[in-house]
Amino acid sequence: MEKHLRLAPSPTGLLHIGTARTALFNWLYARKINGKFLIRIEDTDIVRSKSEYTTNILNGLNWLGLNWDEEPINQSKRVSVHKNYIKRLLESGAAYRCFTSESEILDLREKQKKSGLPPKHDNRHRNLTRKEIKEFISQGKSSVIRFKIDEETEIKWEDQIRGEIKWQGKDLGGDLVLSRRALGDEIGNPLYNLAVVVDDNFMNITHVVRGEDHISNTAKQILIYKALNFKLPIFAHTPLILNSEGKKLSKRDSVTSIDEFKEMGYLPEALANYMAFLGWSIKSPESEILSLSEISKVFNLSDVNKAGAKFNWEKLNWINSQYIKKMELTQLCKFIKKYWEEMGWESPSSEWDLKLTNLIQDSMILLKDAIDQSKPFFILSQMKKEGEEFLESKKEVKESLKYILFYLKEANITKVNKDNAREIINKIIVNHSIKKGILMKSLRVAFFGCLSGPDLIQSWELFSENKIDIPLIERCFN
């Protein structure tokens, strides 16, 4: 039998890092066992579900390289199928109509709260007669459909990550609501637990891999599987992603959507690589920089941790920097030029673009770093305090800069390269007894306004080609 795994997101918001990590684990295991990775959009919440969120989720998965193997299914198009299965449960006696009103439920919960009891339905309408049901309907009362849960029953399964898990029926909050309210003998819109079971069975899902916050849902769903005589899938519950304080990562932790990671300048390969290690570890890793294809060959659900996985920004940044360092120069240049275009910066040539990309590549952590690191080569950089202090620290500082201007003009150099740059530097050192350290620091301050920066000779070439090297040096005398 072909193995099927799935991601079943609700399109009520942007693709979240937690959903993306769940998708990744499903995708990796599907590839490992030569199965299929499927998508089901759980869009039955008419009020909150939006098509633009569906588009965002699918685009985000594509961006991460998580391709799916069949056309995505929309749960909202299968409502009539779900209702038919609810009818089957009603006919078999596994479910019943419950006419308890919202106010009655609130009263019940208030009493339970005062008594220190957890919220739990009292199943008061489980054994209504046909006559009583007709009477409620004639009174215009609406009803939900509830699934009977035997409080004495024990639900257990062998979780692929957590081992054996047991639940007692009495801990599931009373009989489970399968549908929203409806009048007369109608069945309201089916709810999550029923729809999930029916659709997973329809899609021949063999492995359900999802977050640990679904464990209680799994216990309820197993009972529905059995009531409908469906074959149970294998279950695996992944650990939550935690923030630095050990709490569940949420929107309050600023960056959580895949779009935000993309905007910040993370590469999809790097983010996917990092997410794989959020809750999973490889035995005897030769490297932490692995492609999805490489990870899929060694990925196993049994190696996923039970404990929550703390999100580590430093680790993600390091992984991203490694991917930038090994990126082909022309490809990285294309990314960087988009930032230049957004800033309205124009470069002198495509060759110059590649030179600047090569210069800053190894110091970049995020793609967006290209803005700050490229800026001095387009716009006169502001003189920082340490630069101003250095310019006034020794008379040799400004003297060395005057000599640079002199030799540039004497040799009529309009385009600096590494050869004529070194020739000028050597002349100043030999002819004017200026120490090389003073000379190089002076030139760096002129170019960058501070004592740090990328390779000086390569930088000089770029400044010269963009015709701002002389203005940068001359400003030191103003």
From Swiss-Prot:
Reactions listed under catalytic activity: tRNA(Glu) + L-glutamate + ATP = L-glutamyl-tRNA(Glu) + AMP + diphosphate
UniProt keyword Protein biosynthesis present: yes
CDD domains: GluRS_core (cd00808)
Membrane-spanning ranges: none
Gene3D superfamilies according to UniProt: 1.10.10.350, Glutamate-tRNA synthetase, class I, anticodon-binding domain 1, Glutamyl-trna Synthetase, Domain 2, Glutamyl-tRNA Synthetase, Domain 3, HUPs
E.C. numbers: 6.1.1.17
Example GO molecular function: glutamate-tRNA ligase activity
GO cellular component, one term: cytosol
Alphabetized InterPro entries for the sequence: aa-tRNA-synth_I_cd-bd, aa-tRNA-synth_I_codon-bd_sub2, aa-tRNA-synth_I_CS, aa_tRNA-synth_I_cd-bd_sf, Glu-tRNA-ligase_bac/mito, Glu-tRNA-synth_I_codon-bd_sub1, Glu/Gln-tRNA-synth, Glu/Gln-tRNA-synth_Ib_cat-dom
Keywords: Aminoacyl-tRNA synthetase, ATP-binding, Cytoplasm, Ligase, Nucleotide-binding, Protein biosynthesis
Subcellular localization(s) per the UniProt record: Cytoplasm
Motif ('KMSKS' region): 248-252
Signal peptide: none
GO terms under biological process: glutamyl-tRNA aminoacylation
Motif 'HIGH' region per record, residues: 9-19
Pfam family, one: Anticodon_2
The family this protein is said to belong to: Belongs to the class-I aminoacyl-tRNA synthetase family. Glutamate--tRNA ligase type 1 subfamily.
Subunit and interaction comment: Monomer.
Reported function: Catalyzes the attachment of glutamate to tRNA(Glu) in a two-step reaction: glutamate is first activated by ATP to form Glu-AMP and then transferred to the acceptor end of tRNA(Glu).
Protein name: Glutamate--tRNA ligase
Name of the encoding gene: gltX
